[in-house]
Structures are given as structure tokens and as C-alpha cells.
Amino acid sequence: MPVITLPDGSQRSFDHAVSVADVAASIGAGLAKATVAGKVDGKLVDACDLISNDATLQIITPKDEEGLEIIRHSCAHLVGHAVKQLYPTAKMVIGPVIDEGFYYDIAYERPFTPEDMAAIEKRMMELIEKDYDVVKKMTPRAEVIDVFKARGEDYKLRLVEDMPDEQAMGLYYHEEYVDMCRGPHVPNTRFLKAFKLTKLSGAYWRGDAKNEQLQRVYGTAWADKKQLAAYIQRIEEAEKRDHRKIGKQLDLFHLQEEAPGMVFWHANGWTVYQVLEQYMRGVQRENGYQEIKTPQVVDRILWERSGHWSNYAENMFTTSSESRDYAVKPMNCPCHVQVFNQGLKSYRDLPLRLAEFGACHRNEPSGALHGIMRVRGFVQDDAHIFCTEEQVKKEAADFIKLTLDVYKDFGFSDIAMKLSTRPAKRVGSEELWDRAETALADALNESGLEWEYQPGEGAFYGPKIEFTLRDCLGRNWQCGTLQYDPNLPERLDASYIAEDNSRVRPVMLHRAILGSFERFIGMLIEHYAGVFPAWLAPTQAVIMNITDKQADFALEVEKSLNGSGFRAKSDLRNEKIGFKIREHTLLKVPYLLVIGDREVETQTVAVRTREGADLGSMPVAQFAELLTQAVSRRGRQESE
């Protein structure tokens, strides 16, 4: 007689084993219809699974995060059902859930086309309308093998081989189609109505380019059609903001096949880049950092000593010269330790903060490259703080404050902070981990802001703090990091003279605020849709004459503004003023200055914003003051 305890503390007794669905039905017909699965003693199970002993139970519905994930996973199985009906010779591989959706990898004799994707989606809708039950059968291993052998599902058989200890497996039947999964899955296709297939791509078996190529069908699924519509609208907005598209429109950069994953910065984009670099240079100088520069190409010996060669060699670009092996640096930290090691260091020299706008190169797979967001050549606002263990908390607290201030300057105020703690495989004593985690946690607490733990997600040598920004579309971008590291100083023999004249290893804090400049600029482009705040805009003001008679004054204004440190250009083309205004509005120039006869006579400029606001005529000095205020606000709102 199982006694079922519900989340509100109420209990229900049964005189026999009972399924999750039966418990839901005993509560009410509405809940029974909405039941996707259950959580029994904290473990997710199918709605059809039986509960034989006393247990706690949470009914999972589409409103729950777990329910939504189950819907997405079941939609992947539905893709399999539709594909096997339309393309019987296709072989199904895997269909996992991903962020906001799912995909299914499929082996087929030819690449799928957009027309194929439309046909698969149409068949999925037809199958959903049949309103059939999804049937789960726990099946002995030998029978599972027989099922997939009979169906010619070679990849499923390989997956079974990967699980030698599993003697029974869950098979989920969508009518004649069967798939293997740990589950749980929806009990009926009625839960799958709010879905859409989104794109096709190639993939490789087990993610290895040496293996056979597969087709990957991506999709998204939601609890209801309202949520689906909101998601589609968000995706459409994201497509409009695609940094690759805007980068071309605003003449910021380009990429080309001859240099995969390397950015060709155009004048406009390089201006944005330089503004970022000069801003970060000033921030670091004001906060006690020394800027250094280290070599691009370093002997293999250093990478072996640092441990990167054994763990990271396949991602490094290498070369040989005069019987020596070299690597283009994928990161700056070993080189910064070399700078620290030059000359004897005392405890009085600590903390020592070394910063570099370090150009790094990593041999990322070509399929992983994405515009300027994921590249092979990039520059980081990289710095390393060498300090005593007692100084860690203050250095971390100062870094947290600095990082949040920088993000505000770029217009980001929704920041999530997470502390990743010791993983199962780690080096160092428990006492050292305790002290390191406590120091970082105390520093986070000093910020007065919310943060959360990520248990087990730290590096094998130390805990770390991660900063994740949420942009205007609600997307999360992990940018800043502070990594506690006693390991690299040990490997590279860094030390300082302590107060008692003993040699002691410093703690090394790896830190970055923006991360990769390339990726951060891509984020800014999409966050602002190219409508940069005045301080970041490649051109801050354009001066336009109505007729040739005003050309000389327009050039005077341009010279005056540029002489004051602004970025201004004049447009003296023999075009209608309305045409010029429209063109520069589309180019997202913050301020449009129009000069006619009256402005020449009064030595003023007629000021418009790219949003269409008419600010009226004013002396150039007054406009310069207005622009100064806009630039000084950076990305902050006037109220901040």
C-alpha cells in the first residue's frame, strides 16, 4: 500500500502499485490531462511508471522546466517517426535536447534540402493530429539488439554496444517507429503541437570529422503555441541583428576563405575596436595594472612545462625552425609567468597585476567558426594577478566591482555571477580548496548582489567566478572570469620572498572582463542592432550641406569637431538633403548636422538624431558640449 506525499504535504494512499498518471487522475481530470511525467523521490519518471512503495511525487506538466525538456526530447523522436515514414532507408542516430530545442542526427544517402525539412515538418503535424499514445517498454538487452537488427538501425546497435552494463533498456514506440532512450517521454503526441523545425546542418558520427558525415535536423518546441510564436519572433529579431549582416551593412569587417576564423577589420570596425582597447587600457591603468607585451610564438618547451602541450596541442598552431618546435600562443598565462619570474620578487611587490591585450590563436574546427563570435585569431583583455593567499579575497572583490562597472558602461546591467567549485578530479588539499572557495565566496558576498554556486564545475586546480551577461533579446553571454590558480606558478617555478625570507609560491588569478574583443564586439553589434551609443559609434556626427555654397563652413565644422577629439565626417555630395539624411540614418550615425544658408549666416548647425528627433539649430560649441555629455555617459542611461 504505497503512500504518496505530494508537494503541498498532502498524502494519498493506494492499495496497489500505482502509476504517476493514476495519481494525477485521482487528484483531478484536468491534472491528469496535463501530466507529462512525474518526479518520484526527486527522480524523473514516465507517467506510466509504477510506484510500489511510499514516495514523494511531483506531477510534471508542460509548465515545468522539466516538462518542457521532455516535450523537446519527444519531438526529436517524432522527427525520427516522420523521417522513417518519408525516407525508409534513413538510419537514425541520436536526438538530444539542446538549449531551447532539439536536434536529430540522421544518416542518409544525400543531404536533406529545405524542401525535405518542410516535408518532415508537415508529416510530424499529421502524426500529432493522430493523437496517438507513446508506449514505453523496458526491454531486455538481447531483444533490443534483435529489434534494431531487424530494422537495419546500425547506429542504434553501436549505441547499445557503448552500454555493456545495461541489461534492460527503454524502448519508446511511436506507432510502428521505435527509439531507444532513458526517458522520460510524453505519454501522447497531443503535447507536441507547439513545435517548428528550424534548420539543417551537417554533423559527424561521435562529433569526429574523421567519421562519416550525418544530417542534423534542428527544431524547437514549447508548452503552447503562444510561447512558440514569441520564440519565433525573438529568433526573427536575432536574425535582423545578426552581427555578420550588420557588419557588412556598416562596413565594419569581413571574413574570407583564405583566412578562416581570422577577421579583416575595416576602418569603421577598427575604430570600434580601438575605442574598446583604449577604454580598457584606461580602466586597467586606473586600477593598478601594468600593461605588458609577450611573444606570439614560443618554444614547445614552455608549453610542455605549463602542461598545455599534453592537454591542448591539437588546438595549437605549430611550426618548426632550426630543429626546434614552436607554437603560436593559444593563451597568455605561461608568458605572463615568465615576466613575473624576471628578477627577485618580494612580498612587498604583491599584488602584481600584469595585463596584456594578447593576440591568441586556437585551431578551432572549421564547423565551429561563427562570424567574429567564434574565431581562430582573437585578442583578449587578459590579465594575471600574482598575490599572496591572504590577498585573494580583496583582489577578487576589487575585480568584481571593476567588472560590473565596465559592463554598465557598455549598457549591460543584468549580470549573473556564478562560483564554480571543486570537481571530483582535482589537485591540492581539501584545506586549500576550502580557503580558495571561501575567499571567492566572501568576495562575491561583498558585492551585495545575488550569485549562485556551480558545484563541481571548477578547474582541476582551483575554483573560478564566471560573469554572464543577458542581452536585450534575453540571451546569455558568458564573458568575464576570475580563475584561482596555484598550479601554474608551481609548474613554472614562480616564487617570491616572504616576510620570513622563505620562498613561497604566489597564487595566480587569471582574469578577463570582456574576454575576446572579437566576440564582445559581435555581442555589442547584436545587442544594439548596430545603433551604437555615441562613444562607440565609428562616426559620431556627419555634417551635410544643402548646396555647394555651404561646403566651406561644413568643412570648418568637421575640422573643429575632429580637433576636439570627436569622430566627424562631412558629406558634400551633390545630392538632395533628404537623401543624405536617410542614408546616414541607415548607417546609424548618432547625430546628423545640416547646414543651409541660415546656418552659415548664424554660424550654427541644425542638429537631428538618427532616431528622427529635431534638436534645432545651435552653435558648434553647444553641439560639442551635447556630444561630450553623450560620450561621457557611454552606454549608461541618463538616470544612471
From Swiss-Prot:
PROSITE patterns: AA_TRNA_LIGASE_II, TGS
Cofactors demanded by this protein: Zn(2+)
Catalytic activity: tRNA(Thr) + L-threonine + ATP = L-threonyl-tRNA(Thr) + AMP + diphosphate + H(+)
EC primary class: ligase
GO molecular function per UniProt: ATP binding; metal ion binding; threonine-tRNA ligase activity; tRNA binding
Region (Catalytic): 242-533
EC number(s) given by UniProt: 6.1.1.3
Gene3D superfamilies: 3.10.20.30, 3.30.54.20, Anticodon-binding domain, Bira Bifunctional Protein, Domain 2, Threonyl-trna Synthetase, Chain A, domain 2
Cofactor comment: Binds 1 zinc ion per subunit.
UniProt keyword annotations, A-Z: Aminoacyl-tRNA synthetase, ATP-binding, Cytoplasm, Ligase, Metal-binding, Nucleotide-binding, Protein biosynthesis, RNA-binding, tRNA-binding, Zinc
GO BP terms in the entry: threonyl-tRNA aminoacylation
Cellular component terms per the entry's GO annotation: cytosol
InterPro entries: aa-tRNA-synt_IIb, aa-tRNA-synth_II, aa-tRNA-synth_II/BPL/LPL, Anticodon-bd, Anticodon-bd_dom_sf, Beta-grasp_dom_sf, TGS, TGS-like
Residues reported to bind Zn(2+): 333, 384, 510
Domain annotation TGS: ranges: 1-61
Subcellular location: Cytoplasm
Family: Belongs to the class-II aminoacyl-tRNA synthetase family.
Subunit comment: Homodimer.
NCBIfam families in the record: thrS
Job description of the protein: Catalyzes the attachment of threonine to tRNA(Thr) in a two-step reaction: L-threonine is first activated by ATP to form Thr-AMP and then transferred to the acceptor end of tRNA(Thr). Also edits incorrectly charged L-seryl-tRNA(Thr).
Protein name, entry field: Threonine--tRNA ligase
Organism of derivation: Pseudomonas putida (strain GB-1)
Organism placement in taxonomy: Bacteria, Pseudomonadati, Pseudomonadota, Gammaproteobacteria, Pseudomonadales
Recorded name of the encoding gene: thrS
